[in-house]
């Protein structure tokens, strides 16, 4: 099991859908979140992409020098990047960071935003372009270790004599992650990527996705790993966690929800459509309606695009729900929570000790006990080491 955190380059707050409790997106804060994730033992961080975010490559380049082990899951965008240039960027970052780059292949699902970026392709064309893009990207990087060149002529992209002089640290290339819920996305995942990511849907729906992508990959003689993108709201008690969930959306106005859902509804993303269906396009607001599966809450998706669900509960419950997904084949959890700095600490303190032993070993850098200094807390009376309370 691999546990990642999230760098909130599109903003952060104690509440959703309002400027109350908001935090400015500046380097000092992003650095705090990154160094916290690194120190606490998260394996990596996802850096989001899109016009509402700071550029992920620039952010990752700024954060790599202030972290030690943290990996960076950074987007490449077919249509915005050329594959040869993207390969060069990836190899350079991987070399300078000591092999800490992971690639997030993002096709995009908002036609309005895509057209603003100069991409005028429909859904099918974008996936065809993405398939050509990542094929070229992989080949250029793979051949760079032996000094080889690559020729390719496709419908959307072509290269002749493509060559990379400085190969990446990771062989044959930094691992490729990708998410999508359409038939075309599942085919692309089966054919080209290393880890297929899904947004946080109920376990039965996730099981169907995993089975489908796994079967398509097997038909091609490949195996694919699986990950899930979720928010988390964990507190010491179940009641406190659900109270925090309600508080998170307590300032949201109906008008704000309507505006957000109007934007989401225009997208041609199958994943976004599935997220919206979980809360009926923003019409469901009570806990009874938004708890779409035990401890899986769709409240985040009222105003947030992309991943719109959160695991909510006490540490034991959240760890158990994660294990349910792991039993389906999920081995990577890309998590986030509001505010991202505080929730990174809460999750690490409360849930990390409950994860499988091999995860705790990796988090603790070889120490089975976990990531906290000591890990015993503050010395009592200048000499006594605190012990865990007996239940």
Curated annotation (Swiss-Prot):
Pfam families: Bac_luciferase (PF00296). One of its GO terms (biological process) is alkanesulfonate catabolic process. The keyword Calcium does not apply. It catalyses: an alkanesulfonate + FMNH2 + O2 = an aldehyde + FMN + sulfite + H2O + 2 H(+). GO terms for molecular function: alkanesulfonate monooxygenase activity. InterPro entries: Alkanesulphonate_mOase_FMN-dep, Luciferase-like_dom, Luciferase-like_sf, SsuD_RutA_monooxygenase. Gene3D superfamilies: Luciferase-like domain. CDD domains: Alkanesulfonate_monoxygenase. Its EC number is 1.14.14.5. Keywords: Flavoprotein, FMN, Monooxygenase, Oxidoreductase. HAMAP family: Alkanesulf_monooxygen. Catalyzes the desulfonation of aliphatic sulfonates. Belongs to the SsuD family. This is Alkanesulfonate monooxygenase. It comes from Paracidovorax citrulli (strain AAC00-1).
């Amino acid at each position: 099991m691999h546990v990642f955190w999230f760098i909130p380059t599109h903003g952060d707050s104690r509440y959703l859908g309002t400027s109350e409790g908001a935090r400015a997106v500046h380097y000092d804060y992003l650095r705090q979140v990154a160094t916290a994730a690194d120190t606490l033992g998260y394996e990596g961080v996802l850096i989001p992409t899109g016009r509402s975010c700071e550029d992920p490559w620039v952010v990752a380049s700024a954060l790599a020098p202030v972290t030690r082990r943290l990996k960076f899951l950074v987007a490449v965008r077919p249509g915005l990047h050329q594959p040869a240039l993207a390969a060069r960027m990836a190899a350079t970052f991987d070399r300078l960071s000591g092999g800490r780059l992971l690639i997030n292949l993002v096709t995009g699902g908002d036609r309005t935003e895509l057209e603003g970026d100069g991409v005028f392709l429909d859904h099918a064309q974008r996936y065809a372009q993405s398939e050509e893009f990542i094929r070229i990207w992989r080949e250029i990087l793979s051949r760079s270790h032996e000094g080889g060149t690559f020729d390719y002529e496709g419908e959307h992209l072509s290269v002749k004599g493509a060559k990379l002089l400085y190969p990446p640290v990771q062989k044959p290339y930094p691992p490729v992650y990708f998410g999508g819920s359409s038939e075309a996305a599942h085919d692309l995942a089966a054919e080209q990527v290393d880890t297929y990511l899904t947004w946080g849907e109920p376990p039965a729906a996730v099981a169907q996705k995993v089975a489908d992508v796994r079967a398509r990959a097997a038909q091609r003689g490949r195996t694919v790993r699986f990950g899930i993108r979720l928010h988390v709201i964990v507190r010491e008690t179940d009641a406190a966690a659900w109270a925090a969930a309600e508080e998170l959306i307590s300032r949201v106005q109906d008008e704000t929800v309507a505006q957000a859902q109007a934007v989401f509804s225009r997208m041609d993303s199958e994943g976004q459509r599935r997220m919206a269906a979980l809360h009926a396009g923003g019409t469901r607001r009570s806990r009874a309606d938004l708890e779409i599966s035990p401890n899986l809450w769709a409240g985040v998706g009222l105003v947030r695009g992309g991943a719109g669900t959160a695991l909510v509960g006490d540490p034991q419950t959240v760890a158990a729900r994660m294990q349910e997904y792991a039993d389906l084949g999920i081995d990577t959890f890309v998590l986030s929570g509001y505010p991202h700095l505080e929730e990174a600490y809460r999750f690490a303190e409360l849930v990390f000790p409950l994860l499988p032993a091999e995860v705790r070993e990796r988090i603790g850098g070889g120490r089975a006990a976990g990531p906290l200094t000591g890990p015993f807390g503050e010395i009592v009376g200048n000499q006594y080491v605190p012990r865990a309370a007996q239940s």
